[in-house]
From Swiss-Prot:
PROSITE patterns: AMMECR1. SUPFAM superfamilies: AMMECR1-like (SSF143447). This is Protein PYRAB00100. It comes from the Archaea. HAMAP family: AMMECR1. It holds the Pfam family AMMECR1. NCBIfam families: AmmeMemoSam_A, PRK00801.1, TIGR00296 family protein. Residues 7-201 form the AMMECR1 domain. InterPro entries: AMMECR1, AMMECR1_dom_sf, AMMECR1_domain, AMMECR1_N, AmmeMemoSam_A, Uncharacterised_MJ0810.
Length: 205
């Protein structure tokens, strides 16, 4: 994955906000702008996170949906993920337009997931909190947590694995099972400093 320049990150965050606000006004999905940098037409995974402003991280989340795999061009995936995070996250009621004045938009661009090989009990040694996000898969169940989540909650590597299992609807110790697949990925994260404010690259460590 090409490194995402800061100006591209700002472009994606502004695009995500515009996609949400336009959809909440008209019910229509916006088209990618004509001035989209050509690099953002590359297929990449992306998540859009909506956080309430001036609220502790553990209770700030208002929506988060995305595409773990590079199935859409990044610019299109960002538009879709932004809209879905606002109106289709099953954990929350749909966002109302007036709420957007108090919501911080965050975009995480993902590297393709990499399967963690080797004995299950060694998995905690092969991930790093502050760098990696995780995907857990077992049978029909799967769950994903972004790299910023364990930082916000103060988890270590084993807790991060357990919570990703829980997110998948599985027992928290399922990461120790041979037939559970665990993938790691990294993300470049960009967020508004405050609603509609300057966009910054989010450092986790």
């Amino acid at each position: 994955m090409a490194k995402i320049k800061d100006e591209w990150g700002e472009f994606l965050v502004r695009l995500a906000r515009r996609a949400i606000e336009e959809y909440l006004k008209t019910g229509k999905e916006i088209e990618p702008p004509k001035d989209t940098p050509k690099e953002l037409w590359e297929k990449m995974g992306v998540f859009v996170t909506l956080n309430r402003h001036n609220v502790p991280p553990q209770t700030a989340l208002r929506g988060c949906i995305g595409f773990p795999l590079p199935i859409y061009p990044l610019v299109k995936a960002t538009i879709k993920a932004a809209i879905y995070s606002a109106v289709d996250d099953p954990r929350f009621p749909p966002v109302k337009l007036e709420e957007m004045d108090n919501i911080i938009v965050e975009v995480s661009v993902l590297t393709p997931p990499e399967l963690i090989e080797g004995p299950p009990e060694e998995r905690p040694k092969k991930i790093k909190v502050g760098r990696d996000g995780l995907i857990v898969e077992k049978g029909i169940y799967s769950g994903l947590l972004l790299p910023q989540v364990p930082i916000e909650w103060g988890w270590d590597e084993e807790e991060f694995l357990a919570e990703t299992c829980w997110k998948a609807g599985l027992p928290p110790d399922c990461w120790l099972d041979e037939d559970t697949k665990v993938y790691r990925f990294t993300a470049e994260i960009f967020e508004e400093e405050y609603p509609r404010g300057p966009v910054r690259r989010k450092s986790l460590v």
